[in-house]
Structure formats: structure tokens, C-alpha cells
Amino acid sequence: MTENTPVPVITVSNLIKQFGRFAALRGVTAEFSGGKLYAILGDNGAGKTTLLRTLAGLNQPSSGHISILGSSKFHDICQQVGYMAHPSLLYDEMSGMENLDYFARLYGITSRERCAEVIRAVGLDPDLVRPVGQYSQGMKQRMSLARALLNNPKILLLDEPFSNVDTHSATEMVRLLARTRDQGKTLFIVTHQASLLEGAADEFVWMESGKIVGRTRELKRPESHGESAGGNLTGGNLK
């Protein structure tokens, strides 16, 4: 690695995740640089969410190696990563502030000002008292993002943040995520609405059958490499 080569924030090597006899990830090897927005694309069953959950420490790899910001320890990874699940993990009967206060305590954060800060950061009002169950889908997604930002992570892993959101709200969410990237965070976004990220994503990462089969700077699906791909693509393999 030369002086001008960016140090990867995430490195995965021969990553395999099996559920019984089914291999959801099949030997993924890749490096990802920091301060970028990566769109993770592919058909249903390609392994996108499994990769995201495994990077977040929610899935134990069957084999292989993950290093996030130089560490492979689960505790260190949890401190550096924010995860936005699909569907969102919010309590409908609680207000947004109550939700964030609850999850903040799980991180050992006792300052309600931190909760208010992340709510404002996603464009919502911390004084909003009605239950989350009465929020629009766009507001719920913003609140889920606020939850992911609570521990001020350097890396955000977002699963379908535009799901069931109207076009205007989705566009506003993209702008918010781009600003978050511009503040120095690294974002990985799984989505089936790739066109929303055209012009915002730094890189499109294409998955197929549990492997990374291509990485492009433009929203153009690479030719399928089939079994020969091996998921072995690093940050330099861009088209």
C-alpha cells in the first residue's frame, strides 16, 4: 500500500455465511475506503442484507475475516457502526424522543440532549410527542436513521432506507445521507431503488448469489461473471 492509497475502513476476506446448507455469502473479499457512500445492489437473495448484518456484527460469519477500522473485536465494531434495519426497529407506542432515549441508554448514553441533537440532525422536531405509530413512513425512516446515529458511529449500514417512502421524502433522505457522508462518515446503503442514489453514491457494489460481482462508479450493472467472480474485488476494480 503506497502513501497515496487510502487506508480501508472495512476489509473482508473470504467471508462465508451459511444458514444450514444455504450459503448466503460465498467467499466475499473486498476493501472499502472511508468517507464514501456505497450503494449495495442486487436481486432478492443476492446476499445484500446478509452482508450488511454480518458487517454490523448481527450475524456471526461461518468463516472468513472482517476488520472494521483495524479491529475484528465485536465490542469495537459495535462502537464504530450504526445500523438501520428493515423494517425499522422502533416502538410504535412511544414517541420519537422516548424511542431514542431508550436506545441511547443501551449505548450507555444518558444525555437527552444527544437524543434531541440527532433528531434535529435528521430534520425532525425533538418536541414531537405523538407516538411513532402515527408518523408517516418518511418520518419513521428519518427516526430510524436518528437511532443509527446515536452513538456517533464512523460507519453507517442502512438497509432499504427508502422503502415505502414517497418520492419527495426519498429525495430528501438522499440529500440527508449525502450530507452525512460529506461530514466524514462512511455509508453502505442496501436498496432496490438504485436510481435515487445516482449522482450521490460514490460507488455501486453489485451482488449476485452471495458474491460481489462488480463495482462501478456509474449506475451500470456489470456483465455477470458467474462462478468465476469469487467476490474478489477491491476498491481499485471500478468501471
Question: Where are the language model's segments positioned?
Answer:
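Helix-to-loop junction immediately C-terminal to a conserved catalytic motif
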Residues: 56
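H-loop/switch region of ABC-family ATPase nucleotide-binding domains
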Residues: 191-192
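Conserved ABC transporter NBD signature motif
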Residues: 64-77
